[in-house]
């Protein structure tokens, strides 16, 4: 009996050692080449996996304006798996519970996934529109426009959701690395497809270890979007549309490849400025812009104004604009908070179908009878 017991103990010890060796084994970085999720509309990310590994790699390309050949990888660890040898990026345990959002767009994405309770910090809470966040201002901390690192440490975040602007993010990432706080750069705002922007919610669903929910929620958005777009497929009249107002003696105009130009086209209208075919907005001279507003049938996204009188007060020349004379000016600021937040810049990223419905109602009211959700008619 004693001999059998000794053998049994030795057998169990061997199994324990072998099991430990297997669980601690690192999968090589080169093995992460299987497509776990390939976006249909977004171009800035993909999710990769490997055989015999529950962990994944999120690869993000050029996540800020002007970035070229910038590739970032994030290891999403599951079952205690270690990052592959040679991997130098952030390691984020799947199922992140404490999340800091440095853009309100990420609040909207987590809201769409039903995961607002994971948010422990935001940037500029007074400009947030989400009712849940506003109702929990005592417990959800405001990180400020520039990161408050002392406050951040106290929150013990599992991940910080960042957006990059030029090379200014270098100091932020260096500090987060020093503090051993995981982070990920989101690049949804650079997507040229309205649906591509919304598809970034799948990245967040990967972080919270519920990829299936992200895919399920997202796949309904294109269905609604294309059902609305189909309403304009056979129209014969395409009114011309002008964007924006001056900023610092120049007038920034979207590219013909931009998500706004695509929304305008899908809503059955015609973007009036076709000279910019790049992948970014461009400033044009004021005289050129004044010439365009003389001709455009509609004028939208006109800053912070809420009436035609306020718009004309910005510049008396605006009184001569065709859309001002014909009262066809609309602004994307119908959903303002008392503290200055604008829900368009927060939730529209995950509701491109609602934005499209608004625009169809504006340009072709006979096709959509619903009152606009994001847009106000300036009177």
Which residues does each predicted region cover?
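Flexible, glycine-rich surface segments
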Residues: 224, 228-315
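C-terminal soluble interaction/assembly domains
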Residues: 273, 279-367, 377-379
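Extracytoplasmic substrate-binding proteins
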Residues: 92, 148-151, 158-160, 165-250, ...
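Structural recognition of the beta-strand scaffold that forms the well-ordered cores
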Residues: 98-101, 118-122, 159-163, 183-186, ...
